[in-house]
From Swiss-Prot:
Monomer. Changing R127E: Completely abolishes interaction with tRNA. Changing R121E: Completely abolishes interaction with tRNA. Residues 1-26, 42-72 have a biased composition (Basic and acidic residues). Changing K208A: Reduces catalytic activity to 72%. It comes from the Eukaryota. It holds the Pfam family tRNA_m1G_MT. Residues 1-72, 282-304 are annotated as: Disordered. It comes from Schizosaccharomyces pombe (strain 972 / ATCC 24843). PROSITE patterns: SAM_MT_TRM10. This is tRNA (guanine(9)-N1)-methyltransferase. Keywords: Cytoplasm, Methyltransferase, Nucleus, Phosphoprotein, S-adenosyl-L-methionine, Transferase, tRNA processing. GO terms for molecular function: tRNA (guanosine(9)-N1)-methyltransferase activity; tRNA binding. Its EC number is 2.1.1.221.
Amino acid sequence: MENKDALDIGKDDTNTSEADVSKNETQEQPVLSKSALKRLKRQQEWDAGREKRAEMRREKKRLRKEERKRKIEAGEVVKSQKKRIRLGKVVPSSIRIVLDCAFDDLMNDKEINSLCQQVTRCHSANRTALHPVELFATNFGGRLKTRQDFVLKGQQNNWKRYNPTTKSYLEEFESQKEKLVYLSADSDNTITELDEDKIYIIGAIVDKNRYKNLCQNKASEQGIKTAKLPIDEYIKITDRKILTVNQVFEILSLWLEYRDWEKAFMEVIPKRKGILLKSDESFDVSEDTRSQSNQSDSELEKEN
């Protein structure tokens, strides 16, 4: 009896010990609530989809780059530029450059938006220039002003050396008409250097060359001198190229810094456009390429 009782007691102790262990294990692993389980499930699903989301972001980024490249090549947007480092002390120039914004009714809304960007680029280039000029925007109003106000939220009101006016350049510089020079690719006159006493006018229009001789005819009717940049003297462009308003401005600005047309052209005009330097001793083109170059030269226009 004593042995049996002893065995029973030992058995009870064993059962009690196993029950205690099981109870402790249960206490160490608390049961999650329904809300906690839902959160855990959502987290697991989120973690599982991490790679897929990353792939989607990469694809969206690739598509954005392709779309921006297309718009830049089509002239719908202006390519952003790296910040330039000034090579010397800033010394303002006495030259005045005018953006003639009197062509509001000749552009569609898309072209107005593009022109607004180009005007902003002109200011940006002038702000970082070694020899900044006084920049005027004449006949400034209509949809262009509305677009600028919408995009910039009044920031342009704080721009230095930027002078928008509803007046025409003839009204703004009434007593200095003889100093006005309208830049036009159709002019018979070629600029060799910029005159610090002159006022240079750029036709502020985005028209994909729809309006032939527009600025040249306007200036001639008003009795204003015209001139074209000496592009033909320094480079050959074997691809059709239309200079934007801001590109013309940047070329003028860089000439003031370098006093070198070739260097200014090469820094502003994209190299992918098939530029050939005439100063290059190895410059040589076949008859086919020469013919294409001559045709491109006749098509070369700024957007005016």
